[in-house]
């Protein structure tokens, strides 16, 4: 069970490729499916060699903006700048399958997300005047599932996990609204995670990288270009179950968005970087169960055509049994 405990963050790292509601977002609405710095989890590359169930609850809050000098694609039109607040709650269930001893282990997962979002924008009204608008949405978000998560153990201190993750457009969407509890597209994310443990120093390195492929939003005729994302986390573990470290993350757009609005904005290509601290706590419970808690703050340190946030906070709680 000790190995199962260590693997909790690993499989959940593959589950929490977090998506965000459309204020349309480089990328329609200026965000996309993942928030920089929130994807990597402790033990990211480890899939448990023991059959387990894991239940995870995650809460993320973000308050971001793009300056008013930039046009942002949103809901089939453009806004001069954008301010968005998002509170995201995710409940995830994961099953690691009993595949017996060996270097490979496998898991599957399902996530039910709920979102609250408020968007403020400035659009061009009649006569060319700028008009401020505000919109709020609160509902179930697009469903997220990982049909296959494959973990490979190079050694007791070196692990890798491969996954194929899917966001389905199950949330409500209205192209006339600025805030929507859906991106109104399918998103496919192949992802690789790696964990390296240094037992002598109590240091651990975790990294997660993936590429997001989007289908077209047929309601706005907008298609996001593929996005490359990578988060790296280094932590120092202590004997009392507490760890502390830093996270560095980036999202880089690999091409231009397409569609009439994107073409007018020259593809609206974007990128960003985030850097911030993380604190975690792991505790063994009775009957081979375990509890893992985490709290991070990952503010944006550089951003182009993506929401810039100094208030991105994520809290997680995971029970393994």
What are these language model-derived features?
Residues 51, 83-91, 134-144, 182-188, ...:
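Residues that define the transmembrane beta-barrel architecture of outer-membrane proteins
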Residues 28-34, 61-88, 123-135, 178:
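Surface-exposed strand-loop-strand hairpins of Gram-negative outer-membrane beta-barrel proteins
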Residues 30, 68, 74-76, 219-321:
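Outer membrane beta-barrel transmembrane domains
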Residues 104-107, 113-223, 268:
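Outer-membrane pore/translocation modules
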Residues 59-65, 112-118, 151, 166-172, ...:
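Transmembrane beta-strands of outer-membrane beta-barrel pores
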